[in-house]
A protein has these predicted regions:
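Charged/polar low-complexity intrinsically disordered segments
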Residues: 2-3, 26, 41
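N-terminal Rossmann-like NAD(P) cofactor-binding subdomain of oxidoreductases
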Residues: 39-195
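Low-complexity, intrinsically disordered or signal/transmembrane-proximal segments
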Residues: 6, 37-38
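Short terminal hydrophobic/aromatic SLiMs and anchors at protein ends
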Residues: 12, 26-29, 38
């Protein structure tokens, strides 16, 4: 891992997309297998390496813009359908970039991986953001496949809305809903992975 300047975790600000520092801090702690609740600050010396599933769609593009120059996350992997796999991100998007800001330079030449090739996608990431656009049953299956590789999945999909052990978290309102994750891990047979 590449060292970066040390940052105090959690900082006192939020960073958009409905996430607050407290929720990210809890995800980081959950990822490391530590207790979910904490009272003291943790010093971060490395960025968290993340990937985006469904990176070529509208929500995936939004994740790309949110992660550009992010102080805590380093976007290292982009994944999309087999149609986009093997192309650079710029080629895969073509003229379909829908964000108000230009496509970030750092992603233009990243090669898009096939979202179905789970083992290849998770090789270099600490966790993934999921923005895949497919039938709900298939989303549930693929997100759980990623979790079973011990890769936490932060999903923007509603596919797990009625899955009893998958929390739907709005951090400022119900952050304690992540307390159900140990039950999900038991069902999936994982130590770190969850959706």
């Amino acid at each position: 891992f590449r060292k970066i300047e040390q940052r105090v975790w959690p900082p006192t600000t939020s960073f958009g997309a409905g996430w607050s520092t407290s929720s990210v801090s809890k995800i980081k702690l959950a990822k490391l297998g530590k207790p979910f609740q904490h009272k003291r600050k943790v010093v971060m010396s490395e960025k968290i390496k993340v990937g985006i599933l469904g990176a070529t769609g509208m929500v995936g593009q939004r994740f790309v813009t949110l992660l550009e120059n992010h102080p805590w996350f380093e976007l290292v992997t982009l994944a999309a359908s087999a149609h986009s796999a093997g192309k650079t991100y710029e080629e895969a998007i073509g003229g379909r970039w829908k964000m108000e800001t230009p496509m970030p330079e750092f992603v233009k030449n990243m090669v898009v991986k096939n979202v179905a090739d789970v083992e290849d996608v998770v090789k270099n990431v600490d966790f993934v953001f999921s923005a895949v656009n497919m039938p709900k049953a298939k989303i549930r299956t693929i997100e759980e496949e990623y979790a079973k590789t011990e890769t936490p999945v932060v999903s923007n999909n509603s596919a797990h809305r009625f899955t009893p052990d998958v929390p739907m978290v709005v951090p400022e309102i119900n952050a304690d809903h992540i307390d159900i994750i140990p039950a999900q891990r038991k069902r999936l047979g994982t130590k770190r992975g969850f959706v």
